[in-house]
C-alpha cells in the first residue's frame, strides 16, 4: 500500500453538449455507417444493418466515443428491464389471484395471466384453485412478493407505477449522459473509483437497505402470515417502520432500539438475525431471519471492500500495482500489462465479466432448489424446474458470450508488439499443448462416458442384468461426491458448531421437510446412475471449452492461416484458391460452441428434471411414507440410453402430447411449433449459398416477366448470415420444445 499526498485540483470529467440530439439523423436507417446510410441496393443491406447497428467498434475508432455509446446503451437496457418488471407487477395487480394464493399457498396455484375469449382460446384458463381460472405461472414472482412483505394487489399496482417512473428516468439518463454531459475517457478508466462505488454503493448499501427492509417489513409481515392472520388485518409496511412498539410485540429486543448495537451487546438481536441453517418447516423456504442476517453480513463485507482502493486521498490499493506484483515462478512477467488491456479493451473486460457472471448464474441455478430462498417455493415443482432450467440456459449463453468477446478482443484489441512474456503471451505460445491435451481429455471422456452406457445397453439387450454397471450389479458409486455430502451433513456437529442444521437438506443426515403433504426437500442419494451421467456432463463441458478456447487462442493466427487477424472476427473462408480454409474464423468457433453448449445444458436439465421427480418430489401420507412422482425409477432406468429414451423422454412426453383439449393445450401447440422451428434451422445449416442464389435468380426472372421486380436486388444470405439464422432457430426451437415438454409434464403431475 502506498501513501501519497492528496491530489490538489478537482478534475473535470465530463464534456458538455458533445453530440446534438437529432431525430432526423436517427430516422435515417444506417446513419452510423457511410456505406449503409446510402440505402439498400441488395437485400444484404438489411442483414448488415442488423449486424452492425450495435457494433460500436465499426462506427468509430475513438475509444472515448465507443465508451460513451456503451454507457448510454446500458441505461437503455435498464429502462427496458424496469419496463418488463413493471409489466410483471402490473399483471400481478390486475390479472392475478395473488391475494387468494397468499391466504392458501398450499392448495391454490399461482396465476397472473388470463386469456381473453376471442376465438375460443379461453380453454387455456385452467382451474388453479380458489375459484380462479387462469394460466398457471412458474416464474416464482408470488413467492418473492410474499417474502418481501407484499400483502395486497394495490401494493403491486404502486410498485408497477414506480418501476415505470424509473424506466423513464433511465431513458432520460441514457440521453443526458451521451448528449448533455458525456463522461471523458479518463472517467471510464478510473477503475479504483469504479470499484469503490460499485462495491460500497451497489452491493454494500444495496444489501444493507434490503436487510433493513427485511427486518422492518418482511419479517413481521411473514410472521403474521405464517401464523394464519388474514393479510387484510396485517399492519401496512409504513406502520411497522414508524411504530417501534408494533415490532417490539413480535421481537421484544426492538424496544431497546440501537443501544445493543452501540454497546456491542449484539446477541440481543439474535431474535431476528439468526444462524439456524436448514428450512422453515412452515413454508419450506430458508429461514427469513437467516436471510436478513446474511444480507447484513454481506453489506458489512462490501462496505469495507468499497473503501479499499486508492482514489483522491492517496491511500489504499492501486489495481495496477496489485496486478504487476502478481508474478509466480512459472509465469514470466505475470500480470504485467493486464491493467492496460482491461482499461483499453472493453471486449476483454466484458469477456471476464461474462465468464464470471455465467458461472455465477449456474451456481444460482443449483442453489435455488438446494436452498430454496422464498416461502412455498420448494413445493411449487413447476417453478422449481423452471428456475433451474432458466438459470442453466442463461449461464450457458453468458459463458459462450465470454468466449466470443475474448476472441473479438484478440482480433481487434490485442497488440502483439507490446505484449511479451506476460501471462497471456505465455498461454498463446503454448496454445498447441493446451489444445491438444484438452482434445485428448475430450476423446477420453467421450469414449469412456458413452462406453459405460453402451455397455449397459448391450448387457440389457442380451438379458444379462448381473453384468451391468448399476447399484444392484457392478457398482460405480460416486465416492468422492458421497464423501462431500457426508462432510456437509455432519458439519453442524463438527466443523460448523454454530449452526443448528447443515446448509442444505440435500447433503443428507436430517429428515425431510414437507409442506401441505408435498415434499419440499430431502436428502438426495447419489449412486451409479449419477456417476454415469456426471461423466457425460464432464464430456460435454470439456468439448464446449475445447471449441471456445481454440477459437480464442487461434483467433489471430494458426498454422493453416498465419494472417488470420487481418481477415477479422468473422469471415467465411480464406479467399479463393485456398481450399479447406472455411469455418476457421473466431466467429465460427462461437457458432460451433453454441451447439455444444446446447448439448451440455440439455443433459444437465434432463438429469435434474428426472432425478428430482424420481428421488425428491412427491407426496407424503399421514404415516410419513413418501410417494415420489416417478417412484424412484432414476437409479435403474437412467443407466442405459434406452432407459433415457423410454422412461424419460417418451414416458414424460405423454402429458404434452395428450394436452389437446385441456388447459395445457398451448404447450402441445408450442411443442409442435418449436419442433418445426428447430427443423427449419436445418435448412439453413445443411444447405449451400449457391443453391439459394440459383433459386433466387429463377424467381427474379419470373418477377421480371410479370413486371413486378423489386428495385432492391434479392441476394442469398452470405455463408455467415445463413449460419447465424440457422443456429438461432436451432437454439430457439430446441429451448422452446424443452420448455413445453417440461411445463406440460410438471404442471400435470406436480
Curated annotation (Swiss-Prot):
Cellular component terms (Gene Ontology): chloroplast thylakoid membrane; photosystem I
SUPFAM superfamilies on file: Photosystem I subunits PsaA/PsaB
Ranges that cross the membrane: 70-93, 156-179, 195-219, 291-309, 346-369, 385-411, 433-455, 531-549, 589-610, 664-686, 724-744
Keywords: 4Fe-4S, Chlorophyll, Chloroplast, Chromophore, Electron transport, Iron, Iron-sulfur, Magnesium, Membrane, Metal-binding, Oxidoreductase, Photosynthesis, Photosystem I, Plastid, Thylakoid, Transmembrane, Transmembrane helix, Transport
UniProt KW Amino-acid biosynthesis keyword: no
Record localization: Plastid, Chloroplast thylakoid membrane
UniProt key word Hydrolase: no
Reaction catalyzed: reduced [plastocyanin] + hnu + oxidized [2Fe-2S]-[ferredoxin] = oxidized [plastocyanin] + reduced [2Fe-2S]-[ferredoxin]
Membrane-topology annotation of the record: Multi-pass membrane protein
Residues reported to bind [4Fe-4S] cluster: 573, 582
Residues given in the record as phylloquinone binding sites: 692
Positions with a binding annotation for chlorophyll a': 675
Binding site for chlorophyll a: 683, 691
Domain of life: Eukaryota
A single GO molecular function term of this UniProt record: magnesium ion binding
Enzyme class, spelled out: oxidoreductase
InterPro entries: PSI_PsaA, PSI_PsaA/B, PSI_PsaA/B_CS, PSI_PsaA/B_sf
EC numbers: 1.97.1.12
One of the GO biological process terms: photosynthesis
Gene3D superfamilies for the chain: Photosystem I PsaA/PsaB
Primary residence: plastid
Described function: PsaA and PsaB bind P700, the primary electron donor of photosystem I (PSI), as well as the electron acceptors A0, A1 and FX. PSI is a plastocyanin-ferredoxin oxidoreductase, converting photonic excitation into a charge separation, which transfers an electron from the donor P700 chlorophyll pair to the spectroscopically characterized acceptors A0, A1, FX, FA and FB in turn. Oxidized P700 is reduced on the lumenal side of the thylakoid membrane by plastocyanin.
PANTHER family named in the record: OUTER MEMBRANE PROTEIN, OMPA-RELATED, PHOTOSYSTEM I P700 CHLOROPHYLL A APOPROTEIN A1-RELATED
Quaternary organization: The PsaA/B heterodimer binds the P700 chlorophyll special pair and subsequent electron acceptors. PSI consists of a core antenna complex that captures photons, and an electron transfer chain that converts photonic excitation into a charge separation. The eukaryotic PSI reaction center is composed of at least 11 subunits.
Protein known as: Photosystem I P700 chlorophyll a apoprotein A1
Species: Nandina domestica (Heavenly bamboo)
Organism placement in taxonomy: Eukaryota, Viridiplantae, Streptophyta, Embryophyta, Tracheophyta
Gene: psaA
